[in-house]
Amino acid sequence: MNPVIKTFQFGQSTVTLETGRIARQATGAVLVTVDNDVTVLVTVVGAKQADPGKGFFPLSVHYQEKTYAAGKIPGGFFKREGRPSEKETLTSRLIDRPIRPLFPEGFMNEVQVVCTVVSTSKKTDPDIAAMIGTSAALAISGIPFEGPIGAARVAFHESTGYLLNPTYEQLAASSLDMVVAGTSDAVLMVESEAQELTEDQMLGAVLFAHDEFQAVIQAVKELAAEAGKPTWDWKPAVANTELFNAIRAEFGEAVSQGYTITVKADRYARLGELRDQAVAKFSGEEGQPSASEVKEIFGEIEYRTVRENIVNGKPRIDGRDNKTVRPLNIEVGVLPKTHGSALFTRGETQALVVATLGTARDAQLLDTLEGEKKDPFMLHYNFPPFSVGECGRMGGAGRREIGHGRLARRSVQAMLPAADVFPYTIRVVSEITESNGSSSMASVCGASLALMDAGVPMKAPVAGIAMGLVKEGDKFAVLTDILGDEDHLGDMDFKVAGTAKGVTALQMDIKINGITEEIMEIALGQALEARLNILGQMNQVIGQSRTELSANAPTMIAMKIDTDKIRDVIGKGGATIRAICEETKASIDIEDDGSIKIFGETKEAADAAKQRILGITAEAEIGKIYVGKVERIVDFGAFVNILPGKDGLVHISMLSDARVEKVTDILKEGQEVEVLVLDVDNRGRIKLSIKDVAAAKASGV
């Protein structure tokens, strides 16, 4: 087929969608070009048949940045791209979240989306281009999909308002970085970080993005009309209404009673018993439904039971009303040898969070398409299987853990001190020790507490809360502090983090259409109320950062020297600075402008290194008395070392008021003597005197 090209204006950018020239064996393939700078190839492949026995929709999204796109060659021994970076993993999740709910219920055919960045200008993030390309590739593929979607990034400035699809430079000066995706009539996904913006400003950004990306949706529809393949002839399995009614009649009341058990483990055990009874009664014999079909229908009964109870105003699973936060238990300083620690427990969700301070050398080195950069703040989230009472795989962080860690990082990052105020590298680790809903928001609260416990001068404490939604027809209920079951059975996962002043992070995933502005306003309002409640309880335990760092944390001393002294401190081949580090056990970082940061495991080590540097960089002061060591004796006098690397000459006539025949009559090499600096000439030569020391002392020098 001949290539089909569609070009449209998206804010200040010109976007081109092209299909039919590259990757023609994929089910759908689109080449997206933005401003002739960023080019992303997006392919979609769908299996024609479902894999029998899979009880989930096997959708996978892979976003990959090729180094050649930025004119670079990969590092490492093999000189080729390796495992996905954290940025690639996060972008893959960003694309997955808005498209997953748009595949029809019951569709189990495997679908794989691959987004490859093949060219970039290093000015803007290619993620929005990848999201647009995914929407277009799905729209033309013929795979059942209730799209297309649009996507946009929004920045915000107090003076200029909202800005569509900003550059990296514009984002750096912005108080908001938000990505929004959705259909023509609904927002499906929001991912953002902000600097204490109000709820109204955040909601305004969501609505602004939704209005702006309508241009994307229209262009994709036009491309699909011209180049789209016929929609697959797929029909969902016919629901077994008779079996559903039979199981509900037999077990509906028991399931309803099971969901009044407030302890998660006991509730799961009881519902598991009922599920096994249903399988035993309604399957197993010839002519009866399969066990998997019975389990699926039993799950549907659970789903409807919980949702009906909530929208009809009945108490939630654990007995709370819609606005109540679970009981909190907050501790700080729980680990004796760490730099800062906190144990944050909310109901059956618990996070042990630890903050560690390091030197500038501990910063993470990131090799990105834009170039190498150092990241002095890390927040890592771990979710071991024991946190939900299960056995499971132990190993490296998965996509979910990386995503939750990034959300927690976004939440607290805006409240960290500037590098010139607090030049430590900071690593926060959140160990989820119990989980029943919203462990990422527990990590936010725990991170804020641990950082303050470590003495990091936070601008303000931060707390987070997860909101949920159940909507049936015109009835809906917004839930504060959702449980794991409410997250699974609800229609929205809406996480808000911030300070008492404003929002620092907002993440939203919506599974249905019809989420109105009113519902989002209610959710933001309830989240604010809950956040202030949690902050109040956190402040009772630790209201502000400790004034001193932990005794276990490294001591940091900042100082500045003249730039022409840098080479003296470093020494030939780095010999001088290496010697200082080895002898004092401190680490030293020197910048080109003469700024020096000294990190010592103890205060004594840092002070010793500072004194060594001061000694090297100090200049001899005329009229000042020094205690020096005789380094060399010559016929006409003696050379005395008064500062590291600085020797002065005591002429034989300056040794004593009496006549001196031989220098060795008064001095010997290695002897310590007091000397007075008489003069320093324009070549840096120092003239010293021993005989004038007494008079100088008498005059008060």
UniProtKB/Swiss-Prot annotation:
Keyword Oxidoreductase: no
Keywords: Cytoplasm, Magnesium, Metal-binding, Nucleotidyltransferase, RNA-binding, Transferase
Cofactors, names only: Mg(2+)
Subcellular location: Cytoplasm
Record-level GO BP terms: mRNA catabolic process; RNA processing
First-tier enzyme category under EC: transferase
Pfam families: KH_1, PNPase, RNase_PH, RNase_PH_C, S1
EC number(s) on file: 2.7.7.8
Top-level taxon: Bacteria
Family: Belongs to the polyribonucleotide nucleotidyltransferase family.
NCBIfam families (alphabetical): polynuc_phos, PRK11824.1
Protein name: Polyribonucleotide nucleotidyltransferase
UniProt source species: Pseudomonas putida
